Amino acid sequence: MSDDEDDINLYITRSKNNENKKTNKNRLIDNNIQKTKTTTAVLTTRTTTTTTTTTASTQLKWDYGDEDDDDYSAPKDIDEEQSSKQFNYQNNQIVVKQDHDDYSAPKDMDEEQSSRQFNYQNDQTLVKQDDDHDDYNEPKDIDSQSLIDEDCDFEFDNSDFFFDDGTTNNNDNNNKNNKNNNNNNNNNNNNNNYNNNNNKNYKRKYYQSYNNSNNINNNNNNNNDKFEKRLSDLKKTGKEEAKKRGYQVRKTPTKEKKIPPSFKVIDGTNFLVDGFQYKSEDFTHYFLTHFHSDHYVGITKTWSFGNIYCTEETGKLVSHKLGVDQRYIVKCEWNKLIEIQGVKVAFLDSNHCPGSALILFIIPLRNKDGEIIGEESILHTGDFRYNQSMNNYPLLKGRTISKLYLDNTYCDPQYVFPPQPEIIKQVASIVRKENDGETLFLFGTYVIGKERILLEIAKQEGKPVHVSNEKYAILCCLSTCLDINKFTTNELITPFRAVTMSMLSYHNMLSLLDSSNNKYKRVIGFRPTGWTQAKKSITYLNRGPTTFYSVAYSEHSSFNELRDCIDHFRPTQIIPTVDCDSPIKVKNILAHFSDLYEKKKQLTIASFFSAQPVTNFFQSFFKSKSEPIIDEDNKKLIPITTTTTTNINTLTATDTTTTKIKTSNTLIKDEFTDDLIWDCSDDLISDRKLLTQSDNSSALCKIEKEENFNDLSENNNNSNNNNNNNNNNNNNNNNNNNNNNNNNKLIIENDIKEEIIDFDDPVFISQQKWIEKQIYNNNNNSNNNNFTTPTKTNGNLSNNAKLNLTPTQTQTQTPTQNNKKQKTTNVSPTSYNSNNSSQQSGLKRSKSDPNVKKNQLQTSQPPSQSLITSFFQKCASPTSLFSATPPTPSITTTSNQSTKNKNSTTTTSTSTSNNKPFKN
């Protein structure tokens, strides 16, 4: 009996539970029906509101239906025929489809894609709306992803769902989970599916509910007439209503114009080079240097902004890869000028990749009246690798480049790598050694580029290089500049493969090795790029069966090549095109080339002592300074008298010479040449002569040096100067210009006025200091030398007896107390032309001669000193400067008592008095 009672009790319990379930079910159904009645009316009036939502996803808001329908006005952009709508319930999602008879889909959309679609998913409405509305535009202040109710300060949580009684629904068909009287009724009939999963109890008055689609469709059909009336009225006031709601009415949105950087625009034109992302109505002509993605970025298949000028190879790639209409592509021939808006343009090979080009722009220069007065040449390098052969391009040879748009990718001293042919040769050598039939070779490439290595390997090994189908199609576009037979798409016939740079990693190389089915036992990869190793041609890394070579093969100019390019073309202005977004960066880039300009601009005195012609200097600096003076009364030429003071560390003598000039008004072209070469090694001037005289001018040139070049005692200066003056007066009656020994200026006497030229040029002063330093160092070296003891020599001496001295000899006159007459010792490079030069070799130095002078004078001539001494002498005296025989320093001993001292002996000795470099 107990078992029967238990069964009965269980049956009764189950019956009660079933009754409770039915009761709960009926109660919930009644509640939902009541809610449906209230929300249906609201939904029918709010349906048009959803069509005005312009964001990608929205959330609907509903109220209790107490709004007055008469106060509602539909959006202005809904036509009468657009008022019918369809709402379909599918798995808790409402799909709203609206038919637009007057709607025209965009060109790239199908008819089905042109209609608006509203997708309700997880309490969110996804709204897709076309962009071609004539009268409507989305407000700026509305988020394009979600539109939250203005009165709601929270967002829906899709993970939680609540009922009216506060209990949770687990959304499960299992009846064991219905402990809280929750009913999960999952029926396949969408028309009778009252879903309770999305009912949520909120403290606010807004909630969402998904209703039966049949009821909604019926309500829509019943209210069509009402909507048609309202829409016909709103056509008149649609724009005003939109303005009240804050919408901006415009047909097409305007995008902000991008301003291109200066290095993308050719100065003086509206030409844009490699700047397609900055396309606008301001530019109608666009230039593409080569087909690399960082240069053609901005070009799409819908390009219609202007002509694209490029080479034939690049034009084929633009059409093939990007799908640009052929009518916008202008393929230009190599090395041929074309005219675009009055500007001549030419494409030259840039040695970068197939089809890459330098672009030369020749822009006419006009005056205010519009007349052409000249032309300006601008060169844009794009990406290039400089080669000496570019100097011989017919369109560039001898042309002055005003602006150079420079590819400065490797403008850094650390990027110095060998030339391309050398790197290709090294790679080919490695392949030849390692190609044993069991090695797979990988070569990193770009879309285009690095083809020279591939062609060399295929030529050397006699096998083509495998490329992908896409790569092969690209190479076919370049068939005019490379051999397409060197490439194949069959990887089974060759161990050489061209891969992308990303494939040159350890794991990728291993995977390729494994996929070869043991055909290859090891793999070698080459990464040809100049970024990897500066100043090293090839480096490698070995790891198991993989070997990785980093090759300094670059298709950009190295640092040295950039300097060679600038040094050759010498543009007026350099405009960098890489990493130049700030003035500091531009300044640092240009600093690498500043020395190339400075060395050309500086005119230093050092050039006078080099083996370079100095004709221009003398003709410009001493122009009309050494021309003959014409006596207007006698119509005769007055001889030019030059007074030269010679400095050999110590001021030992003065030499006065008078140069007779031919009585001819024509230039002396038969005696002078156009250049002057100074031989620094021998301290001599060549026998070439410089034309320094011209007609129609007159001047008297004197170069006088102050006496304090050297440290001499006042007594010696006075005695020597007095004797010099006496001797010069006796021997040269017409010369009165040797008395001023305290002037350190170049005096030009021209009739009445005196033109004084000081040596105050900064370059002259800086070089003079350098020369003084050299002389000072030489003097110190000479003071430390051990000099030989003078030997006594007997011989017959005349009044103008001379002593020949070499630059290494030092001579000093030993004074005597019993000398009755003062003697002067004159040193001059021109004194070797005197009549007594035959007696120079017979002179010997005597230490015990009683007629030796008191003063000790140093007469040694270091090499650098004789350069300076001769320089000032030559500037002053055309005879001494351009004499046929090189001058030799000498000492001239002069006596006032010629008859008494014929047999006397003159003794010279060495003095090591303090020597100071001369100052300006």
From Swiss-Prot:
It holds the Pfam family DRMBL. The keyword Nucleus applies. Its main location: nucleus. Residues 84-95, 115-127 have a biased composition (Polar residues). Residues 97-108, 128-143 have a biased composition (Basic and acidic residues). It is found in: Nucleus. Residues 163-200, 715-742, 777-841, 856-865, 890-920 have a biased composition (Low complexity). InterPro entries: DRMBL (IPR011084), RibonucZ/Hydroxyglut_hydro (IPR036866). Belongs to the DNA repair metallo-beta-lactamase (DRMBL) family. This is DNA cross-link repair 1 protein. It comes from Dictyostelium discoideum.
